């Protein structure tokens, strides 16, 4: 059986926590963001690397594999000048408490992060800084759209 057979609905990641509040996947031995500056990494790789601030237009839709802590989403929401659409797939979603611990490393994103976590608790649609954000935790629980 492959790795996908090990993914149970509602599976949460196994996490270790490194200095500075960096979550590290015990399954993949991989930090969720840079140990030396997660937000700087996100701004360089995700935002600048994809030229997203300049490319973001009404109707532009971003798809991502691995939502993780939601740092890419939060960083983009912080700079977005138009409503953003983002779809992300996560096999091992973090619990809101785990996200809160990870988000503590980014005080400048605190308000957006709190809105994100509040909406994730019911696993449906949430509003983040006046934009719609839809999060589905588990494909077996998806509503009919």
Model regions and ranges:
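Conserved SAM/SAH-binding loop
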Residues: 69
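Conserved glycine-centered beta->alpha loop in an early N-terminal alpha/beta scaffold
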Residues: 66
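Rossmann-like AdoMet
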Residues: 1-63, 74-108, 131-133
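S-adenosyl-L-methionine
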Residues: 100-145
